[in-house]
UniProtKB/Swiss-Prot annotation:
<keyword id="KW-0813">Transport</keyword>
<keyword id="KW-0472">Membrane</keyword>
<dbReference type="GO" id="GO:0046933">
    <property type="term" value="F:proton-transporting ATP synthase activity, rotational mechanism"/>
</dbReference>
<comment type="function">
    <text>F(1)F(0) ATP synthase produces ATP from ADP in the presence of a proton or sodium gradient. F-type ATPases consist of two structural domains, F(1) containing the extramembraneous catalytic core and F(0) containing the membrane proton channel, linked together by a central stalk and a peripheral stalk. During catalysis, ATP synthesis in the catalytic domain of F(1) is coupled via a rotary mechanism of the central stalk subunits to proton translocation.</text>
</comment>
<dbReference type="GO" id="GO:0005886">
    <property type="term" value="C:plasma membrane"/>
</dbReference>
<keyword id="KW-0997">Cell inner membrane</keyword>
<keyword id="KW-1003">Cell membrane</keyword>
<comment type="similarity">
    <text>Belongs to the ATPase delta chain family.</text>
</comment>
<protein>
    <recommendedName>
        <fullName>ATP synthase subunit delta</fullName>
    </recommendedName>
</protein>
<dbReference type="InterPro" id="IPR020781">
    <property type="entry name" value="ATPase_OSCP/d_CS"/>
</dbReference>
<comment type="function">
    <text>This protein is part of the stalk that links CF(0) to CF(1). It either transmits conformational changes from CF(0) to CF(1) or is implicated in proton conduction.</text>
</comment>
<keyword id="KW-0406">Ion transport</keyword>
<dbReference type="InterPro" id="IPR026015">
    <property type="entry name" value="ATP_synth_OSCP/delta_N_sf"/>
</dbReference>
<dbReference type="Pfam" id="PF00213">
    <property type="entry name" value="OSCP"/>
</dbReference>
<comment type="subunit">
    <text>F-type ATPases have 2 components, F(1) - the catalytic core - and F(0) - the membrane proton channel. F(1) has five subunits: alpha(3), beta(3), gamma(1), delta(1), epsilon(1). F(0) has three main subunits: a(1), b(2) and c(10-14). The alpha and beta chains form an alternating ring which encloses part of the gamma chain. F(1) is attached to F(0) by a central stalk formed by the gamma and epsilon chains, while a peripheral stalk is formed by the delta and b chains.</text>
</comment>
<keyword id="KW-0066">ATP synthesis</keyword>
<dbReference type="GO" id="GO:0045259">
    <property type="term" value="C:proton-transporting ATP synthase complex"/>
</dbReference>
Length: 186
């Protein structure tokens, strides 16, 4: 069993694996990763682009045309651009965020790193990020990079997902636990 098969799975994993292998052959893994990160940021910033990615209403031709224009405007070319256009042509844009995550996991594994998905109520400052990275690195024995998402609905604390493990130290979860405990007392 190849290392790639143990890191990613499903449709998004297959697409990400194909992209990773192409990028490896071309020696442009870092450039492709940077292009995908830029596109991921554009999708997060634009409600219209997010709607294009997630909505099944648009035809494949409309998606390819729109994505092509976005890629050209963002200066994303080569392997990454061709990959995203192929995904649009195959009507799989809805899975693009999962493909980004799977590709990032493959790149991190190649570098001997692991990616921790961290959800926080407010942005972490540099000192907190460094402390969290250090604590996770001690637990895993690997270099850890953080994928931080801000979600005010967790109220406080944080949620850390690292591989198949998850630690939920959010205030929302603690309050829900207290609420359930109080219901049982009645």
């Amino acid at each position: 069993m190849r290392l790639v098969e143990t890191i990613v799975s499903g449709m998004a994993g297959r697409y990400a694996t194909a992209l990773f292998e192409l990028a490896e052959e071309a020696g442009s893994t870092d450039a492709v990763a940077a292009d995908l990160d830029r596109l991921k940021g554009l999708i997060a910033e634009s409600a219209d682009l997010e709607r294009l990615v997630k909505s099944p209403v648009f035809t494949a031709e409309e998606q390819v045309k729109a994505v092509g224009a976005v890629l050209a405007a963002a200066g994303i070319t080569g392997i990454a651009a061709n990959f995203v256009k192929l995904v649009a042509q195959n009507r799989r844009l809805f899975a693009l965020p999962s493909m980004f995550d799977a590709f990032a996991a493959l790149v991190a594994a190649k570098r001997g790193q692991t990616v921790a998905k961290v959800t926080v109520a407010e942005p972490l400052n540099d000192a907190h990020q460094a402390a969290l990275k250090e604590a996770l690195a001690q637990q895993t024995g690997k270099d850890v990079s953080l994928d931080v998402t801000v979600d005010p609905s967790i109220l406080g604390g944080l949620i850390v997902k690292l591989g198949s493990r998850m630690v939920d130290a959010s205030l929302k979860t603690k309050l829900n636990s207290i609420r359930h405990a109080m219901k049982e007392v009645r």
